[in-house]
Swiss-Prot record:
Protein's name in the database: Oxygen-dependent coproporphyrinogen-III oxidase
Protein origin, superkingdom: Bacteria
Family under the similarity heading: Belongs to the aerobic coproporphyrinogen-III oxidase family.
GO BP term, example: protoporphyrinogen IX biosynthetic process
Subunit structure: Homodimer.
Amino acid sequence: MSAIDKEAVKQFLLSLQDSICQQLEQADGTALFEEDAWQREPGERLGGGGRTRVMTNGAVFEQGGVNFSHVAGKAMPASATAHRPELAGRKFEAMGVSLVIHPKNPYIPTSHANVRFFIAEKEGEDPIWWFGGGFDLTPFYPVDEDCQSWHQTAKDLCAPFGDDVYQEHKEWCDKYFYLPHRDETRGVGGLFFDDLNEWGFEKSFAYMQAVGEGFAAAYLPIVERRKETPYGERERDFQLYRRGRYVEFNLVYDRGTLFGLQSGGRTESILMSMPPLARWEYRYEPQACSPEALLYSDYLKPRVW
């Protein structure tokens, strides 16, 4: 197995955060990210620090957050050891970049991406490590061209790593970003992977890099195509209603959110994925044959793109 290089992973993640922020600022044309660099106090349950960057009230993006964090703890939280009992009693480090973009225009999909590295160590034993991550798209008024180009970018970046990688990680994404209480997928998916170490460090790291860099390549062309689409109050209301699903998923099911909160992570950074505005409506039903109804009938279930 190739040597584990934690510093190389960290430097890649820092440069990825810089690159994505620059590209999003360019796409917005008005707003800039504000950085909040933070460091854990000695003696806290979780050590380490990070850079939280948030953009608000842009011309294109209502709110966007791009987080880097590198934290360490003396014991893994329950959310991690539940499916990996061998991690109990090990000290750990977790580092990653996580981002969520909430555009103003309802015709631009919300998007999310995350790439991360975990290592859990115990004296006298081999380290347990893995990579995880992915990206997914949540349209409110989906356009097939956008969904297809998003998945094509995902397919292309997976190709060098194996013939089955796209299909496996696409299906994993469909299963992961699913709300059982609504019987809906969160959006049209993308890629999701976790616990990746069977390829060895070098190839696993290379794949994580490809996914991290693939996000902007997949998302920004969609932003450009849709940012001038006219919309009114009806579309805005529906966007805010559907953002409620984003909140439901993140607070009830998302493993990263649960891990962060259970391990004593930085709450403000963890919850920066929340939309600035969302709404709920009792027993909402879209009008028959409307564009809103089309989202439910055709897009909130796994599809071949």
